[in-house]
């Protein structure tokens, strides 16, 4: 089982790249985001690898980060009807943090922006992964957890009121949730809505 490739980038194609390791070329299929982040051919490259084995095929999928690979696994192993091609399309359209945000907020429209992902598939992704998003949110896990509470309507009243107030001021729901999450760290978990709004506006002014 191959978990990582470290070698020289030989070439980049539309949906894959070729990595040379001591004279052996490895083809790794990648998301558009990973391909865009690759260095120029001839330079050193490191890819996190998921080895996909079927009766008639062995294929390597490459990712620029371990977190992106974890999301690929999450989509592939937990959402019926989502194969490798669709999972890569999703990760080409949404960065892991954006995907976690969309799932936490139950933003079907955001998830369905990926090619090949219709409304039904997007709904299935949100339903199947809503409880897993915070654990796979990377550094933004606290913010994702708050957004999940907002999406489920179970966030404490001061938080809900603060987010609503910022939205009424013209900020997007996602931006408002980020600001309030940051405000919570400064103002404390027991802060009232007015304090969260005040600290949230300070965050937005930075």
Curated annotation (Swiss-Prot):
Keyword list (alphabetical) reads: Cytoplasm, DNA damage, DNA recombination, DNA repair, DNA-binding
Could you tell me which InterPro entries the record lists for this protein? Answer: DNA_helicase_Holl-junc_RuvA_I (IPR013849), NA-bd_OB-fold (IPR012340), RuvA (IPR000085), RuvA_2-like (IPR010994), RuvA_C (IPR011114), RuvA_C_sf (IPR036267)
Q: Where is this region: Flexible linker?
A: 145-154
Q: Which Gene3D superfamilies match?
A: 5' to 3' exonuclease, C-terminal subdomain, DNA helicase RuvA subunit, C-terminal domain, Nucleic acid-binding proteins
Q: Would the keyword Transport turn up in this protein's UniProt record?
A: no
Q: Does the keyword rRNA processing apply?
A: no
Instruction: Output the GO biological process annotations, alphabetical, semicolon-separated.
Output: DNA recombination; DNA repair
Location within or outside the cell = Cytoplasm
A GO molecular-function annotation: four-way junction helicase activity
| Region span, Domain III | 154-206
Ranges where the record places region Domain II: 65-144
Major localization class: cytoplasm
Sequence segments annotated as region (Domain I) = 1-64
Q: Which family does it belong to?
A: Belongs to the RuvA family.
- Quaternary context: Homotetramer. Forms an RuvA(8)-RuvB(12)-Holliday junction (HJ) complex. HJ DNA is sandwiched between 2 RuvA tetramers; dsDNA enters through RuvA and exits via RuvB. An RuvB hexamer assembles on each DNA strand where it exits the tetramer. Each RuvB hexamer is contacted by two RuvA subunits (via domain III) on 2 adjacent RuvB subunits; this complex drives branch migration. In the full resolvosome a probable DNA-RuvA(4)-RuvB(12)-RuvC(2) complex forms which resolves the HJ.
Comment field on protein domains: Has three domains with a flexible linker between the domains II and III and assumes an 'L' shape. Domain III is highly mobile and contacts RuvB.
Under the heading NCBIfam families, the entry gives: ruvA (TIGR00084)
Recorded protein name is: Holliday junction branch migration complex subunit RuvA
Q: Which organism's genome codes for this protein?
A: Mesorhizobium japonicum (strain LMG 29417 / CECT 9101 / MAFF 303099) (Mesorhizobium loti (strain MAFF 303099))
Which gene name belongs to this protein? ruvA
């Amino acid at each position: 089982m191959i978990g990582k490739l470290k070698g020289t980038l030989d070439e980049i194609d539309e949906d894959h790249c070729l990595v040379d390791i001591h004279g052996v070329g490895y083809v790794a299929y990648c998301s558009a985001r990973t391909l865009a982040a690759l260095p120029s051919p001839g330079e050193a490259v490191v890819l996190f690898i998921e080895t996909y084995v079927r009766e008639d095929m062995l294929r390597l999928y490459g990712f620029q980060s371990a977190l992106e690979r974890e999301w690929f696994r999450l989509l592939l192993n937990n959402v019926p009807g989502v194969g490798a091609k669709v999972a890569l399309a999703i990760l080409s359209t949404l960065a892991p943090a954006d995907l976690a945000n969309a799932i936490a907020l139950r933003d079907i429209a955001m998830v369905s922006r990926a090619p090949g992902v219709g409304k039904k598939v997007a709904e299935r992704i949100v339903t199947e992964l809503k409880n897993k998003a915070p654990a796979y949110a990377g550094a933004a896990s606290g913010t994702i957890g708050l957004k999940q509470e907002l999406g489920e309507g179970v966030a404490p009243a001061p938080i809900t009121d603060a987010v609503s107030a910022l939205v009424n001021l013209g900020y997007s729901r996602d931006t408002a949730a980020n600001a309030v999450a940051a405000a919570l760290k400064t103002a404390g978990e027991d802060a009232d809505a007015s304090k969260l709004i005040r600290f949230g506006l300070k965050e937005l002014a930075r």
